[in-house]
Amino acid sequence: MKPRHKRAAIIAGGLAALGIAAYLVLNAFQSNLVFFFSPTQVFAGEAPKNRAFRIGGLVKEGTVKRDNLTVAFVVTDTAKEVPVSYTGILPDLFKEGKGVVAQGKLDENGHFTATEVLAKHDENYMPPEAKAALDQAQIQKTIKSLK
């Protein structure tokens, strides 16, 4: 084999290996990608059904119902509400009226079943996505009240 052909074969093999590696990385990234939605976006049908995503907002006052390890509550962004159920131990900082981000799936009836629940960790912190969703919902609420 001539040196030029050998070099071309090595370059072609390297490019093929690089392409396969890039495909595998992107495929793994896509399967682990979890999007964030506010209750308003979920209510509008923007969230996927039967696919994992995160929902964030505030735990609505008076909606937490406990039954052993199963907890049902409502997440709100002050404009819309989504019922959530979770089986497991909640974080110590989980409280009504406080910020929460839950990861799970939405069923056909609009009920969110969480596999993980995260609570804010001090009085000044709220996840950026949840803060932005609450601010957007408040703006929409203000605009509607002005009309």
Swiss-Prot record:
Query: Which pairs are disulfide-linked?
Result: none
User: Which Pfam families does the entry mention?
Assistant: CcmE
Per its UniProt record, what InterPro entries does this chain match?
Answer: CcmE, CcmE-like_sf, NA-bd_OB-fold
Primary location = membrane
Q: Where does heme bind?
A: H121, Y125
Compartment(s) of residence: Cell inner membrane
Record's GO cellular component, any one? Answer: plasma membrane
Segments on the Periplasmic side according to the record's topology features: 29-147
Superkingdom of the organism of origin = Bacteria
Q: Which GO terms describe its molecular function?
A: heme binding; metal ion binding
Output the Gene3D superfamilies linked to this UniProt entry. Nucleic acid-binding proteins
**What membrane topology term does the record carry?**
Single-pass type II membrane protein
**SUPFAM superfamilies in the record:** Heme chaperone CcmE (SSF82093)
Q: Which NCBIfam families match?
A: PRK13254.1-1 (NF009727), PRK13254.1-3 (NF009729), PRK13254.1-5 (NF009731)
What job does this protein perform?
Heme chaperone required for the biogenesis of c-type cytochromes. Transiently binds heme delivered by CcmC and transfers the heme to apo-cytochromes in a process facilitated by CcmF and CcmH.
Similarity comment: Belongs to the CcmE/CycJ family.
What is this protein's record name? Cytochrome c-type biogenesis protein CcmE
